């Protein structure tokens, strides 16, 4: 199955994942619950090597078959700009997900998670080593702390 077919067949799962992750509050400096959910999700996919670093980034590295090839890094941030930690209502209407933070950047986090699901299910070993980083502290006073911790 190619990735386009996979995406079509798993679209409802992708939407449900977006709704679930969006409902977990994650203001900068308080991403612990969202990071824990993501890391556990990756472990359930078979990525036991996924971990949360000291900067609250969730990191999952997949070794490539050619260790001399350049490493590719894919990132999306887990925090939201909203300062409080109250539950965020999520509304699905006419196939559209409406919620604070869903487009910045929760949908992209979920796209990375679904990509990792595809790679796991298809047992794909990439040529290049791939690092998937769901980084923290991107918004506002977070000042890209998660990104800077990665480099």
Task: Name the predicted role of every residue range.
Residues 2-98:
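Acidic/His- and Gly-rich active-site-bordering loop/insert found
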Residues 100-103:
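Loop-rich non-cytosolic ectodomains and luminal regions
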């Amino acid at each position: 199955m190619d990735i386009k077919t996979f995406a079509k067949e798993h679209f409802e799962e992708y939407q449900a994942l977006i709704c679930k992750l969006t409902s977990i509050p994650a203001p900068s400096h308080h991403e612990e619950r969202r990071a824990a959910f993501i890391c556990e999700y990756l472990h359930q996919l078979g990525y036991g090597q996924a971990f949360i670093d000291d900067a609250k980034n969730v990191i999952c590295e997949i070794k490539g078959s050619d260790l001399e090839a350049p490493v590719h890094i894919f990132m999306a941030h887990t925090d939201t700009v909203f300062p409080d930690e109250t539950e965020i209502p999520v509304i699905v209407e006419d196939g559209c997900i409406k919620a604070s933070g869903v487009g910045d950047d929760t949908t992209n986090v979920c796209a990375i998670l679904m990509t990792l699901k595809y790679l796991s299910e298809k047992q794909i070993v990439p040529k290049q080593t791939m690092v998937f980083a769901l980084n923290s502290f991107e918004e506002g006073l977070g000042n890209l702390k998660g990104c800077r911790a990665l480099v």
